[in-house]
Amino acid sequence: MKFFALTTLLAATASALPTSHPVQELEARQLGGGTTRNDLTNGNSASCADVIFIYARGSTETGNLGTLGPSIASKLESAFGRDGVWIQGVGGAYRATLGDNSLPRGTSSAAIREMLGLFQQANTKCPDATLIAGGYSQGAALGAASVEDLDSAIRDKIAGTVLFGYTKNLQNHGRIPNFPADRTKVFCNTGDLVCTGSLIIAAPHLTYGPDARGPAPEFLIEKVRAVRGSA
């Protein structure tokens, strides 16, 4: 897979999109707005949340939650309470640059170390917390690589993971290596070419908003409650 395919298609997407997806909306989803949350890194171990959600945004997205993360966070907070869940985006060494998509694991080694560090910090700071995770596009590859590389003792604390537009979906057979399939939910739209082994960005790759507002957080909530009970 060549990096030029990704950059060329990003430039060409506007002229090729169906009229049902306005160019401005799609550009905003791929390149625009985002929110930053650092509840884990800023939080006090004396007041740990019961649940910690660690999320990796897609390429070029701003903040550390990007475009989809805030919707998931909102639904999680509705379910568990504002103090019952900590929301943590992956920032720091994870730059979410386009070129890193072409690396063997779909992101950089530095980014993987960054997300691993957040899982490790969650385990050290809040050892009784239930962990959940997610990622979009390059962030999905990052989430998968990080979970795969975790020490098994920490990995076993992850109740569920959601991946959108998973760039390593084909290579990893629709799952996360070394992680239970029943704790993984992959969202790959029909026509999203990155889910079939390409780095070509087509319109379906940019339309995961409804999944982030509904099925994805609902899956995570279900998995957390299976571990912690319905309270």
UniProtKB/Swiss-Prot annotation:
Pfam families: Cutinase. It is found in: Secreted. Residues 1-16 form the signal peptide. The record marks 59, 138 as: Transition state stabilizer. Disulfide bonds join 48-126, 188-195. The 2 disulfide bonds play a critical role in holding the catalytic residues in juxta-position; reduction of the disulfide bridges results in the complete inactivation of the enzyme. The keyword Glycosyltransferase does not apply. It is an enzyme of class 3 (hydrolase). The keyword Signal applies. Keywords: Disulfide bond, Hydrolase, Secreted, Serine esterase, Signal, Virulence. It catalyses: cutin + H2O = cutin monomers. Gene3D superfamilies: alpha/beta hydrolase. Its EC number is 3.1.1.74. The active site is at 137 (nucleophile), 192, 205 (proton donor/acceptor). GO terms for cellular component: extracellular region. One of its GO terms (biological process) is carbohydrate catabolic process. GO terms for molecular function: cutinase activity. Catalyzes the hydrolysis of complex carboxylic polyesters found in the cell wall of plants. Degrades cutin, a macromolecule that forms the structure of the plant cuticle. Allows pathogenic fungi to penetrate through the cuticular barrier into the host plant during the initial stage of fungal infection. Belongs to the cutinase family. This is Cutinase 2. It comes from Fusarium vanettenii.
